[in-house]
């Protein structure tokens, strides 16, 4: 089915002046505080998101169909032929690998980013909130696993060498970090969009489970959409050109490392969707509560 295009929205790659980008950082910072509330540094949490998670946990939804043992054998690394797994198990093993990749990156970046109270520049405050939002997403992912009866899923210890590599990446000059960081957010958004579309076919036989996973997913997706705009705002004209060139190799490298991906998604089409990303294709349920750069909105 073709995406529904809505007027008034433009490409994420739309040009922006330096002044527009400065104004949009101010706008985004206000949006973050309004949506997230107070940052809880020690807990790597945000007050409003903490309340939202508590509401989910107070209204428990659990599947009536236990996840097979093949999940436990394959969720960290694929041991079996992925074609032998049913689609629900395949989705869950992919989701774990995807989320753990995120967790490793944000855990290393957190140690390199100053707390809000010590941040000198606005972009440092924005980045700290951004990382706290990502940690909140990890809790929502865990809630998804609990919905499927997988209460013991954890992300495991952070490999020392991996932490060092991610930490070194976080210390690079902003102009070097901005394009790959932007593409990473764009890649995440395309994954969430595809997951949202496939829920009916995979868990439609349990409407309460389907609806709960969709609620959790869209809470993450709303932030991810705002992160795409935020990361776009870090880039000048050269950064935008570099980001466009990085989409293809980054998509290939990431999805090529997860065997489940090619069985669940049309990753080639996802890459094309990212290269042509347009806010007009986002559902109003997500778009209306997220944040969009002003230069990506047509008058």
Question: Model-derived features: where do they sit?
Answer:
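Non-heme di-metal
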Residues: 1-299
């Amino acid at each position: 089915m073709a995406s529904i295009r809505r007027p008034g929205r433009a490409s994420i790659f739309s040009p922006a002046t330096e002044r527009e980008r400065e104004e949009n950082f101010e706008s985004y910072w206000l949006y973050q505080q309004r949506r997230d509330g107070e940052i809880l540094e020690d807990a790597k949490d945000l007050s409003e998101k903490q309340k939202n998670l508590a509401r989910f946990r107070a209204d428990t939804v659990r599947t009536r169909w236990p996840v097979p043992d093949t999940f436990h054998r394959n969720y960290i690394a694929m041991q079996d032929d992925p074609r032998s797994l049913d689609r629900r198990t395949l989705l869950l093993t992919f989701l774990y690998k995807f989320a753990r990749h995120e967790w490793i990156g944000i855990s290393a970046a957190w140690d390199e980013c100053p707390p809000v109270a010590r941040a000198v520049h606005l972009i440092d405050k924005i980045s700290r909130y951004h990382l706290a939002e990502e940690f909140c997403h990890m809790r929502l992912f865990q809630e998804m696993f609990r919905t499927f009866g997988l209460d013991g899923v954890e992300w495991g210890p952070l490999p020392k060498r991996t932490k060092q590599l991610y930490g070194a990446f976080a210390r690079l000059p902003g102009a070097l970090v901005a394009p790959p960081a932007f593409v990473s957010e764009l890649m995440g958004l395309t994954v969430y969009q595809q997951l949202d579309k496939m829920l009916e076919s995979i868990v439609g036989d349990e409407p309460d489970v389907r609806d709960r996973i969709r609620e959790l997913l869209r809470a993450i997706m709303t932030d991810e959409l705002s992160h795409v705009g935020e990361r776009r705002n870090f880039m000048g004209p050269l950064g935008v050109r570099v980001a466009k060139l990085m989409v293809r190799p980054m998509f290939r490298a990431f999805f090529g490392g997860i065997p489940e991906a090619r069985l669940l998604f049309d990753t080639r089409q996802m890459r094309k969707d990212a290269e042509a990303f347009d806010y007009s294709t986002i559902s109003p349920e997500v778009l209306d509560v997220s944040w969009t750069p002003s230069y990506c909105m047509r008058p």
